Every structure is written in structure tokens, then in C-alpha cells.
Amino acid sequence: MSFVNRIRDIVGLNESLDYDEEYETYDVAADSYNGYNDAAETSSRRRQRNHTPTASIEPVSTASNVIGLPGLSSSSEVVVMEPRSFEEMPQAIQALRERKTIVLNLTMMEPDQAQRAVDFVAGGTFAIDGHQERVGESIFLFTPSCVHVTTQGGEQYLNESPAQPVQTTTSFGRTATPTPAWGTDSRYAAQ
């Protein structure tokens, strides 16, 4: 045996030609020539081959089949977070994974860090099929998929635009309403 074949045997790449299967060999032709065809012995072989052991059935308790779901309890939990830095954001994702609702108050953070934090938590919320809503100035609500957010009127809140247009101040001191994303053509306005 060469060195390469030994390595293949060790690694398991060489397929062995020896099989561990057992075959029952019956020499039917030899039995017919010898006149040795005993029907009683043949039927006893068939009975032995067809005999299957019966399995004992034990009653299974239903309590052992119950699997607990972590984070899924009768009471829900709301976590209010007021982070001061982006490093606290993985805690919000972990809370969402535990099916907890997050109220994220970002007033204590710098605006660029707050935007980064909202993007990070929004991505995590999207990944678990959760919902996100802006509640107020720099305050956001992130919920897992098992929580549905409704407004006071009872209808489901689906990222609707505010009823009153947002007023912005131009560099000339005048107030102006921003142009809608769909333009001024009313055919493309949301109904």
C-alpha cells in the first residue's frame, strides 16, 4: 500500500470495497438436485424471517412535551431608555429580541449620534418583523412583531403623515410649507 493510499484511508477518502452487509445464501439449485426440499423446514425459515419483535408502548406524560418560550409571558414589559451614547444601543436590540417594547428617548444624545442610534434600532426592529413609530421630538417607540400599535381613535397607526403640514423657516425669515415628496400634482397624492 502506498503512502498516498494510507493517507486516504486515514482521512476517509478511500472507499472500502468490503461491505458489512449480510446476505442469506440459498442454494436452491443444489437442493433440487439432491432431492432435499423439505417443506416443513422451508416454512419454519419463513416464520423466523417474518417474525418481528413487538415493541412495548409506554404512556408518555404530556408535561414532558411542553417547551417554554423565553420572553413570552402573560405580562408584557415596556423598557424606557434614555441613552447618552451609541454604545447603549445593543441593549435595546436585546430587549426587542426578548419581545419587550422599547421607548427610546434620544434627547440626551447629540443629533448625529441620535440618528445613528435610530437607524441601528430600526434595522434590528425590521429584522425581527417589529414595528417602529415616532412618538414625539426625539422619542421613538419600537415594538416586537407580537405588539400592534393603535392610535387613540382605535385605528392602526401606519406611518401616516401629520394632519397639519410642517412649517419651516427659510433663510429669509418667512415660513414655508415644504414641498410634498410626490410634488404638486394631485394625481400622485395619497388618497
From Swiss-Prot:
Gene from which the chain derives: sepF
Gene Ontology biological process terms from the UniProt entry: division septum assembly; FtsZ-dependent cytokinesis
Subcellular localization(s) per the UniProt record: Cytoplasm
Function field: Cell division protein that is part of the divisome complex and is recruited early to the Z-ring. Probably stimulates Z-ring formation, perhaps through the cross-linking of FtsZ protofilaments. Its function overlaps with FtsA.
Subunit relationships: Homodimer. Interacts with FtsZ.
Disordered as annotated region, ranges: 157-191
Name of the protein described by the UniProt record: Cell division protein SepF
Ranges of compositional bias, category Polar residues: 157-178
InterPro entries: Cell_div_SepF, Cell_div_SepF/SepF-rel, SepF-like_sf
